[in-house]
Swiss-Prot record:
Induction of expression: By heat shock, salt stress, oxidative stress, glucose limitation and oxygen limitation.
Name of protein: Glucose 1-dehydrogenase 2
Native species: Bacillus subtilis (strain 168)
InterPro entries attached to this UniProt entry: NAD(P)-bd_dom_sf (IPR036291), Sc_DH/Rdtase_CS (IPR020904), SDR (IPR050259), SDR_fam (IPR002347)
Residues given in the record as NADP(+) binding sites: 11-35
Length: 258
């Protein structure tokens, strides 16, 4: 637990399930105020709210499309209305998109992933930074990227491109705001055993995926959440512009061991 996080206010986008849910729940354990965001899963958001409150935090949920400015504004307005400020912005919402060879991909399929993953992250960061700058808040922006900011993902060019974009966005924002006391970092998860990750469900795909991971195990959402709590705490006060890989060594090119 990080005592400096007690009473701080965070927005966590896409927090009705998976990694976002785990981060929001961990923030509850840190006794933080959390704005839970969902787009199409109100029951999941309700569950997240309940767990945050059980953990000792305070929470409210908002339905919003993070790829739209009005969606991000609704999140910020809710944070200010209920908790009076914003200290931490976690841009977690992400969309894998369809798998297709690039020459066969529609512009619509490309654009949807870019809109959510890149534009949504930018809009979330922009709103948070604007609030922090106006109010002299030495806050944190945390972007959830992926190992695919470094490892190309076959037949999913839009996803790899979006995560590579998040990497450079994180570093550029960190450079721009470091002297203002605002830290901007990213987490790049590997294969995490969430309810929607099919690679961790079926035995054939499980074994295929495990061969890519030196630790021979899938990550847990709670392990990503632990990294998130550390990065936005004062324990990481000298860390900015960094991507923390939570991947069991997946980016270490395990094929070199063969």
């Amino acid at each position: 637990m990080y005592k400096d996080l007690t009473g701080k206010t965070a927005i966590v986008t896409g927090s009705s399930k998976g990694i976002g849910k785990a981060i929001a729940e961990r923030f509850g354990k840190e006794k933080m105020n959390v704005v839970v965001n969902y787009h199409s899963d109100p029951s999941g958001a309700d569950e997240t709210l309940e767990i945050i409150k059980q953990n000792g935090g305070k929470a409210v949920s908002v339905e919003a499309d993070v790829s739209k400015e009005e969606g991000i504004q609704a999140l910020l307005d809710t944070a200010l209305e209920h908790f009076g400020t914003l200290d931490v912005m976690v841009n977690n919402s992400g969309f894998n998109g369809v798998e297709a060879m690039p020459h066969e991909m529609s512009l619509e399929d490309w654009q949807r992933v870019i809109d959510v993953n890149v534009t949504g992250t930018f809009l979330g960061a922009k709103a948070a930074l604007n609030h922090m700058m106006k109010n002299n808040i030495k806050g944190n922006v945390l972007n959830i990227s992926s190992v695919h900011q470094q490892i190309p993902r076959p037949v999913n060019v839009q996803y790899s491109t979006s995560k590579g974009g998040i990497k450079m966005m994180t570093e550029t924002l960190a450079l721009n705001y470091a002297d203002k006391g605002i830290r901007v970092n990213a987490i790049a998860p590997g294969t995490i055993a969430t309810e929607s990750n099919v690679d961790t469900k079926k035995e054939e795909s499980r074994q295929k995926q495990l061969k890519k991971i030196p630790m021979k195990a899938f990550g847990k959402p709670e392990e990503v959440a632990a990294a998130a709590a550390w990065l936005v705490s004062e324990e990481a006060s000298y860390v900015t512009g960094a991507t923390l890989f939570v991947d069991g060594g997946m980016t270490l090119y395990p094929s070199q061991l063969e």
